[in-house]
Amino acid sequence: ELVRTNQAFARFVPDEFLNFLGKESVIDINLGDQVQRQMTILFTDIRNFTSLSEQMTPRENFALINSYLNHMAPVVRQHGGIIDKYIGDSIMALYPDSPVQAIKSALVMRGLLKEYNRGRKRAGYPPLDMGIGIHTGVLMLGIIGEEHRMESTVISDAVNTASRLENLTKLFGVSIIISQAALDADPACRDFCELRYLGAIPLKGRSQGLGVYEVLHPDDSTYEAKIANRELFHNCIAAWEALQDRKQGSRDVFAQYLKVFPEDSALNYYLNRSEYFFLFPDGDKK
């Protein structure tokens, strides 16, 4: 009976969570059990799901979410990750060993999404798109609640940062963004995949900008162009970050890049920022 209880419980709280807390069984868990350790957090989210959801019935909504998660969630486990929770169409996953595992998961997910969309197209449904944010930091894992209702949770600013990186993918028009902190946690990250520096980006709750990178994936139609123009883009960002007066010179910084690779969606972030500084030169740069 205890085995069946643990198996049922594992569908809601992963066995790895019990291991982190030093517990053998769900019945050993107590309110306030906790542990602190460094991990990598991966956040995924379906783009524009709200507008898509409004066009479907409740049954269709849940069918889509469960179908999508059934394709994506196993990828996390196959690469050493733990699914902490589903938040609607979003996945929050933890990787206790290396951010390389999270990068592998993200790239496989992108490939699976392409295959998944082929099936949706054949069925007459619109394609889905997704954003992925990856960050590494110290987490507190533990049990919260009260006597009659307890649940596992993760508390950390690193979780908020990973979620904000996923949101950044929309602003930059890219699929996968990883933080400098994640790359620094394991040097193997830089050897495993192609990266493109996107800048030191101001995030809510941080006094300094966080260095972020795009993880390039071969399925991207602009993959080769991004690699070919990577150094020029990096130089433009460095020049932009060094500007004292972004109202006057910010657009000039990207003028050459616009001529070479105007299709680069990441340009929109900086051009929009340039417009902001033109309209509000004394405003909050965040």
Positions of predicted regions on the chain:
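Regulatory cytosolic signal-relay segments
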Residues: E1-Q36, N268, D282
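Short, flexible loop/turn motifs enriched in small residues
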Residues: D33-R37, P127, Q208
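Cytochrome P450 core scaffold surrounding the K-helix E-X-X-R motif
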Residues: I143-E146
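Alpha-helical scaffold within the catalytic cores of cyclic-nucleotide enzymes
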Residues: I65-G81, M92, P96-I132, T136, ...
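Cytosolic regulatory/linker segments at or just downstream of nucleotide-handling modules
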Residues: L139, T169-E241, R251-G283
